[in-house]
């Protein structure tokens, strides 16, 4: 049977081993977290909820106001969302996201770059 929750074992085989439960999917309507706003400010961009129902955020240039990218799949988690559930879970998910997207997260100006810097 399909469960609506996932479990993750952190620090397997050590004294710090623990099991964390978290939702498989997240609500379709995303709320912008202060972490993401701060990261966007550091990059010199602004963020708003996306007009695309399949994405979380739209990224805009502060200088021109022009839309640069739509980032984050709606219904999926990100670092601030996972960190709110459990700090260790947030760190684990972040490190795995960065490994998985290593090839496309460094090219400035791409959606992958903004997703990495703002959501993770």
What spans do the regions from the language model cover?
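Arg/Lys-rich, low-complexity, intrinsically disordered basic segments
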Residues: 1-120
């Amino acid at each position: 049977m399909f469960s609506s929750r996932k479990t993750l074992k952190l620090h397997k085989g050590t004294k710090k081993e623990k099991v964390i439960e978290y939702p498989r999917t997240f609500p379709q309507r995303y709320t912008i977290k202060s972490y993401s706003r701060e990261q966007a400010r550091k990059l010199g961009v602004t963020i708003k909820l996306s007009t695309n129902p399949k994405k979380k955020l739209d990224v805009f240039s502060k200088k021109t106001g022009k839309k640069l990218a739509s980032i984050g799949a709606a219904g999926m988690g990100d670092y601030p969302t996972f960190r709110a559930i459990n700090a260790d879970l947030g760190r684990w998910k972040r490190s795995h996201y960065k490994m998985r997207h290593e090839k496309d997260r460094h090219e400035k100006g791409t959606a992958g770059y903004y997703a990495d810097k703002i959501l993770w």
